[in-house]
Design a protein with these regions (language model features):
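Short glycine-enriched, charge-decorated loop/helix-capping segments at active-site entrances
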Residues: 80-81, 202-203, 242-245, 305-311, ...
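Conserved SAM/AdoMet-binding glycine-rich loop
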Residues: 108-110, 118-119, 222-345, 356
Length: 467
């Protein structure tokens, strides 16, 4: 794997903007406004990438619509983390054959993490002739060029070569929300957990320059953004590849000192790099949300070693205990994998006891999914699927009870919340910790911070009244 970082020059980006202009001119000649649909699978980084795809499409003259039917361009931005996600993509790609029969000039593209897998691009070439283009995450910045070539050359485009990881500043974005924004601070991953395909499809870690991140945050705040989430496969590794010595905690502090009323969140943190400096920084700045997503994956030190996670149960608990000591109101969430190859019943029980000891606000739970090309895919896995399902169901039941118990403790408390939308006759808001709150109020409150007194709670959400 090529480990060098390519910095996309302004001249290279200007070339892409020129392709946008050429595409817009093609449609002007036809005398109509084209439409495009971008379907996103997977993580928040993919959501951020889709905002760039929509930005390029808008600059090329397209109107963004919410369905593939009738769209001149369909882009499927894919996820490769689990087999189920890949099968969904292939199923939906197959369904697009019918859409394309009704609209033969429709152009279909597959991008994202799946596009970085050789087996996927080969399968698309052989079995999905209606797909016009495939490009990996390394080539997202070249999307206008790829689209223009498909439109003018009338032949399929595959931009999937093993390129070095790139960073491109200045790609236009069409964001999903004016109130909330994703800000990528780094790309790729160096951890190589044995079950994870991300380092193979997104490349090695590479950090954006702090001044570029700060400029983007300033622009968002000036435009009215109230909730900024910093993104990276492992945000705690930020800056290790940069000169100047700024690490992630330093970056957080710099953003927290920007003027304006807003909250900062971040994901995802890797426990191996989550130390006291990070937690002390979170505690020191009110603009940094008292919320932490810290995946533990397994409560068994032996399983963690087999996963190549670079920490054990004790080190993880040490980090969590310190974080809670400096942030007593911390909202803590995590990821956990059930049924990793070789996981015994006793090791699964270690996961249960860790959950009960830590008391997470919420968990994102997954049954192990083998990914071709990763070491875990070839590990001996004697545990039957039925047993993995049983463990998964038990874990979810334990966590759901904890989540509801924690939510009940909020009844009677008054929480500062960002009002972000409507749900039927009620307004919706998010607490600093990310909890959903429903309450009665005027539409004019949307986009403001309000104090809400909690009056009811379920496993998944809270209800309340304006204080």
């Amino acid at each position: 794997m090529n480990t060098k970082t390519t910095l996309i020059s302004q001249a290279q980006l200007e070339d892409q903007f020129a392709y946008c202009d050429k595409i817009a001119a093609l449609w002007q000649q036809e005398g109509r406004i084209p439409s495009a649909y971008v379907e996103t699978y997977g993580c928040q980084q993919n959501e951020a990438d889709s905002e760039k795809l929509r930005g390029y499409l808008t600059q090329s003259g397209y109107t963004i619509i919410q369905q593939a039917e009738g769209a001149d361009v369909v882009v499927m931005n894919t996820c490769a983390i689990r087999e189920h996600a890949e099968q969904r993509v292939f199923g939906n790609l197959g369904a697009l054959t019918h859409t394309k029969r009704r609209h033969p000039e429709q152009k279909i593209f597959l991008c994202g993490c799946m596009a970085g897998e050789t087996k996927v691009s080969q399968r698309i070439r052989q079995s999905y002739p209606h797909v016009d283009g495939v490009f990996s995450t390394h080539h997202l910045w070249q999307f206008p060029e790829i689209l223009y070539n498909v439109l003018t050359q009338k032949k399929r485009q595959f931009y999937v070569a093993d390129e070095p990881g790139s960073i491109a500043e200045g790609i236009p974005q069409v964001r999903d929300s004016q109130l909330k924004a994703w800000v990528s601070i780094m790309y790729g991953c160096n951890n190589f957990c044995t079950y994870c395909i991300v380092p193979y499809v997104r490349g090695r870690e590479r950090s954006r320059q702090p001044e570029d991140i700060l400029r983007e945050c300033r622009e968002l705040i000036a435009a009215g953004c109230k909730d900024i989430t910093l993104l990276g496969q492992n945000v705690n590794s930020y800056g290790k590849d940069l000169e100047g010595g700024m690490d992630f905690a330093d970056l957080l502090a710099a953003i927290a000192q920007l003027p304006g009323e807003f909250l900062i969140r971040f994901m995802t943190s890797h426990p191996r790099d989550a130390g006291k400096k990070l937690f002390d920084t979170m505690a020191a700045y009110p603009k940094i949300a008292c919320q932490l997503h810290l995946p533990f994956q397994s409560g068994s030190s032996r399983v963690l070693k087999a996963m190549n996670r670079h920490y054990d149960r004790e080190k993880y608990l040490e980090a969590v205990n310190y974080a809670k000591s400096v942030m007593p109101d911390l909202v803590l969430t995590s990821d956990v994998i059930v049924g990793f190859p070789g996981e015994t019943e006793e090791e699964f029980e270690e996961t249960i006891t860790l959950i009960q000891q830590v008391h997470y606000d919420a968990l994102f739970t997954f049954i192990f999914s083998p990914r071709t090309g990763t070491p875990a895919a070839s590990m001996d896995d004697p545990t039957p699927k039925e047993e993995k399902n049983r463990r998964f169901d038990r874990l979810c039941a334990v966590q759901n009870a904890i989540s509801e118990q924690i939510h009940q403790t909020y009844i009677g408390k008054t929480l500062r919340c960002l009002v972000d939308g409507q749900d039927k006759e009620l307004l919706t808001a998010r607490t600093e910790g990310g909890r959903l709150v429903r309450f009665s109020g005027c539409d004019s409150l949307i986009g403001t911070f309000q104090n809400i007194t909690i009056t009811g709670a379920t496993t998944w959400s809270l209800t309340g009244d304006l204080a």
